[in-house]
Amino acid sequence: SRVSFSLSDGTTGVLNSGSRLSYSLPFSNERNIDLEGEAWLNVAKDEEHPFEIRAGGSRIRVLGTSFNLSAYPAENYVEIVLQEGSVEFSSSEDQKIMMEPSERLVFQDGEVKKSIADPEKYNAWVQGRLVFREDPMAEVARRIERWYNIKVVLADKELEKYSFRGTFVDD
């Protein structure tokens, strides 16, 4: 199930199923959170107190923006899709990457890949929709499993070669 939340600094967000967000109190000067799983965040702007997220062995520094962040431990990667504003991603002290709106960053096995993305596809779950745009069937199965808390089995290995385009709406 999805859970909406508000933090004392004005930041709002939605946690996806199977996700956990934690932070220390008081949450004012040090705006640091830890995330396991997936969250859509609308971070309140405060230039004097940057918002920092630790997820999947990386740090995401935010000044005020909205974006989707996915870092499920079992999936072994971090994915950020920026809707508006800017974020700074780092996996180590010497590697810092700035992101702009409509960019997608994936951090996996020590490698960072950045590409152009449609934020609507990655943020649709917040409105109760799963959107697929030519996604591999293994990815479709994984997201449906998490969304509905069920096990999906592709009956034939040949299906993994195909992609899927469509939208599931949760009424």
What is each residue range found by the language model?
Residues S1-D171:
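A residue-level detector for the "anchor" residue at the start of short, highly conserved motifs
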